[in-house]
Regions:
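Glycine-rich phosphate-binding loops that contact phosphosugars or nucleotide phosphates
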Residues: 40-186, 220
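Active-site phosphate/pyrophosphate-binding segments
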Residues: 8-45, 143-152, 159, 164-232
Length: 232
């Protein structure tokens, strides 16, 4: 077995950029909550989560948590699959939640084009000047943009949680939402601290298993989406 000589260390992580992006994301809280309030005031019968690739898996915890802690009708679709079958539960009484980091994810753009024709409300986390953002804005749908580039999935998780949990709160299913959302203000410092604390263990595991014939990722519940993403 070849000796491991390269060491990827935490100082390569751009801490200041990470914290700055975290502030931007948290600063979107009010805008996201307003979107939640609007769809609740307008009324809806079900929520559909729509994504492909990483977005599909990032939305998975929301489906799990909403199903576990509320009686809201929620389902999730791979955008390519949805474009094939046009699910009948997407109607004028549906709230569709989607996202596109690039702003022009082909399958998501295609899906929203026929979804808006059903009269469904759409909330998209994407670039306002991207193809998806421009289209949905023209159609009077909700577009929320957070211009961040570091941190992986966790920025998306915070935004998705604000939306889903505020909707649950409005429906009487999450009475401590404000306490939760206030507490999220320090989450990025906590996540950075976890990185620091885990760095040595991660290096040890990498040295021990980097050349293993195969790896098994274990997860369930709210963690299953991210576990699947690791494998995919």
């Amino acid at each position: 077995m070849a000796e491991v000589t390269e060491k990827v260390i935490l100082p390569k992580f751009d801490k200041e950029k990470y914290f700055k992006d975290g502030e931007i994301v948290y600063g979107k809280r009010e805008e996201v909550e307003e979107a939640a309030d609007k769809v609740c005031a307008d009324g809806f019968k079900n929520i559909v989560l729509l994504g492909i690739g990483g977005t599909e898996f990032e939305l998975a915890p929301i489906e799990y948590q909403v199903k576990k802690y509320s009686d809201i009708d929620i389902s999730a679709y791979n955008a390519a699959d949805a474009n094939t079958v046009h699910p009948k539960n997407i109607t004028k009484d549906t709230v569709v939640v989607t996202a596109s980091a690039s702003g022009d994810t082909v399958e998501v753009v295609e899906a929203t084009e026929w979804i808006v024709e059903t009269g469904a409300q759409v909330i998209a986390f994407t670039k306002k000047e991207g193809k998806l953002g421009k289209f949905l804005t023209e159609k009077g749908k909700i577009v929320i943009e957070a211009d961040v580039t570091t941190g992986g999935c966790e920025f998306s998780y915070v935004l998705f949680n604000f939306l889903a949990f505020k909707i649950m709160n409005n429906k009487g299913a999450f009475p401590k939402y404000k306490e939760f959302a206030d507490g999220m203000k320090g989450v990025f410092q906590n996540l950075y601290d976890i990185r620091v604390q885990f760095d040595a263990r991660a290096e040890e595991a990498a040295k021990k298993y980097y050349n293993a014939p195969y790896s098994i990722f274990c997860g369930s519940g709210a963690a299953w989406g991210e576990t699947s993403l690791c494998v995919s």
